[in-house]
């Protein structure tokens, strides 16, 4: 009887389950390894730091954002062109040779973003940053003309007005050490609202500051998900405090973009086109002129018109095509076509064109418009806020370089407090070199990741990165490649003298990415930054108590400083 009971226990469902579980797992593992044989075979030929069995370098990407970034860069840097890392079963390959970067970024085949971008989905939907295929192509083609120079020139007045507002706000910090990033972040949001979105700040019941802070915190959450194997799981993520906080932040972010679209649609229905903020500026200027004339409307003076005509003639004669606008001179993309080729009807600001296209039957829905607005608001504000903050920090450290920038601005403007013109920005050659050098040493987007659907044969050596791998352009290492830059860790604006650029590989400098998926707003960003930063430096001298060796870099999606961007301002004029 005892024997029968034991036999029955051995034949119970639970015992059969456990008996079959082990061989099932073994067979599954064998199948899984065989299905990845091609990946493992090619990965075995790639150089990289030694990792632990099974987990690879998983523990290197767990921890504080600043330490993760430093560890990954430190372990990759000793390898000349390429470095592989295993994050558990995931193969990540870092490339930082310009020849290899060109292969990846210039291709129309390797354009799929890495799987980590899926965490942006609740925020950005299928906007330009993460969409693929025909949807991405058609929307990119639709949006690109809204960031051509002829459109951007119409924003000059708004760039100036918002820059003067920043200068006024900075008076509260005279002589004190403070974090300039908060000011830069708020300013870039408000400039975006008035230019690309074409709405007035007066229609917003909250400033851009709350939006900017929400975006920064969202980036923290996304980066936490990138670093945690548990938070990557959607179900586990919904059980955490991060999920609730993400919902609150998205209410702020989407609340602003929804309000922007609603405001712009209302203006459209009333037949108003163009920037509402620009209309307000013009109305205010006319009112001031009317008051100066004793309340009598007069025929507009031809003097102002003649001045504008002379300005336009200067712009036409200027070597605009020779300017880089945030990338290596000579590197071209869909933002570099002749402005006359885009047609008069397409010379509309971003949101104007989106709404008009939908109204005229283009294949873009209200949801897709919102996704693109969310994307442009994110990409257009956080990157330039970081870039301008690094620039001011570096000016504060390198007083001799700041002297040359101030001398250049004084030669352009003299003692005048007049607003900058487009022609003025063309003459800010040394300031532009300083800005480009800032973006070289501290690129706002430190990593550009793509997921390979096909093998990628590299040019730098006899290496093939297998399909299924995530290949990442390590922009920080690319921009500090000692074979490209003589003193890669020294801040030297002369790295961007025309003769030096001419001898450099086009893809040795890609702060806004490059190729088909380059940042659609890079020209917008450079023009905005030149006017914003020149306006600040015309009014203030910048100081810093730190050196670059004190910078603790962290990459929460966007490259920033862990300790913040602390500077001190001294007024240049009374």
UniProtKB/Swiss-Prot annotation:
Residues 288-327 are annotated as: Disordered. Residues 305-317 have a biased composition (Basic and acidic residues). The keyword Acetylation does not apply. Its EC number is 1.14.-.-. GO terms for cellular component: endoplasmic reticulum membrane. It is a peripheral membrane protein. It comes from the Eukaryota. InterPro entries: Cyt_P450, Cyt_P450_CS, Cyt_P450_E_grp-I, Cyt_P450_sf, Cytochrome_P450_Monoox. Its main location: endoplasmic reticulum. This is Cytochrome P450 4g15. Its cofactor is heme. The lineage of its organism: Eukaryota, Metazoa, Ecdysozoa, Arthropoda, Hexapoda. GO terms for molecular function: heme binding; iron ion binding; monooxygenase activity; oxidoreductase activity, acting on paired donors, with incorporation or reduction of molecular oxygen. The gene is Cyp4g15. Heme binds at residues 379, 519. It is found in: Endoplasmic reticulum membrane; Microsome membrane.
């Amino acid at each position: 009887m005892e024997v029968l009971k034991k036999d029955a226990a051995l034949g119970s469902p639970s015992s059969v389950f456990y008996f079959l579980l082990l061989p099932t797992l073994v067979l599954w593992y064998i199948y899984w390894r065989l299905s990845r044989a091609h990946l493992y075979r090619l990965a075995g030929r790639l150089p990289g730091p030694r990792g632990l069995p099974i987990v690879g370098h998983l523990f290197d990407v767990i921890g504080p954002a600043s330490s993760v970034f430093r560890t990954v860069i430190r372990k990759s840097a000793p390898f000349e062109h390429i470095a592989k890392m295993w994050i558990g079963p995931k193969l990540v390959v870092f490339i930082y040779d310009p020849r290899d970067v060109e292969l990846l970024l210039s291709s129309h085949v390797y354009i799929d973003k890495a799987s980590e971008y899926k965490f942006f989905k609740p925020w950005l939907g299928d906007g330009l940053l993460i969409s693929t295929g025909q949807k991405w192509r058609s929307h990119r083609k639709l949006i690109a003309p809204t960031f051509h120079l002829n459109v951007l020139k119409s924003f000059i007045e708004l760039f100036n007005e918002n820059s003067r507002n920043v200068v006024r706000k900075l008076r509260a910090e005279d002589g004190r050490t403070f974090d300039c990033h908060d000011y830069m972040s708020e300013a870039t949001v408000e400039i975006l609202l008035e230019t690309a979105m074409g709405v007035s700040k007066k229609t917003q019941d909250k400033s851009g500051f709350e939006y900017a802070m929400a975006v920064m915190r969202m980036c923290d959450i996304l980066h936490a998900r990138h670093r945690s194997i548990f938070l990557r799981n959607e179900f586990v993520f919904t059980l955490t405090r991060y999920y609730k906080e993400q919902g609150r932040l998205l209410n702020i972010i989407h609340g602003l973009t929804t309000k922007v679209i609603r405001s712009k649609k209302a203006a459209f229905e009333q037949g108003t086109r163009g920037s509402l903020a620009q209309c307000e500026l013009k109305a205010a200027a006319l009112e001031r002129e009317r008051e100066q004339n004793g309340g009598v409307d007069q025929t507009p003076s031809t003097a102002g018109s003649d001045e504008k005509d002379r300005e336009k003639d200067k712009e036409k004669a200027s070597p605009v095509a020779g300017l880089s606008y945030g990338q290596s001179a000579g590197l071209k993309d869909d933002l570099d076509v002749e402005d006359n080729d885009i047609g008069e009807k397409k010379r509309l600001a971003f949101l104007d064109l989106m709404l008009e296209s939908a109204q005229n039957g283009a294949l873009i829905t209200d949801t897709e418009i919102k996704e693109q607005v969310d994307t442009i608001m994110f990409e257009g504000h956080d990157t330039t806020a970081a870039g301008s903050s690094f620039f001011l920090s570096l000016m504060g450290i390198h007083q001799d370089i700041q002297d040359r920038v101030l001398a250049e601005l004084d030669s352009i403007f003299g003692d005048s407090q007049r607003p900058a013109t487009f022609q003025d920005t063309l003459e800010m050659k040394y300031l532009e070199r300083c800005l480009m050098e800032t973006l070289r040493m501290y690129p706002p987007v430190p990593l550009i990741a793509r997921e390979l659907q096909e093998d990628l044969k590299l040019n730098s050596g006899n290496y093939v990165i297998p399909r299924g791998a995530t290949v990442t352009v390590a922009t920080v290492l690319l921009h500090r490649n000692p074979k490209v830059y003589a003193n890669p860790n020294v801040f030297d604006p002369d790295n961007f003298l025309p003769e030096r650029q001419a001898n450099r590989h086009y893809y040795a400098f890609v702060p806004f990415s490059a190729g088909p998926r380059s940042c659609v707003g890079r020209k917008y960003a450079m023009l905005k930054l030149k006017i914003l930063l020149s306006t600040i430096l015309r009014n203030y001298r910048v100081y810093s108590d730190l050196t670059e060796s004190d910078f603790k870099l962290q990459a929460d999606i966007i490259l920033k400083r862990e300790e913040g961007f602390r500077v001190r301002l001294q007024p240049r004029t009374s």
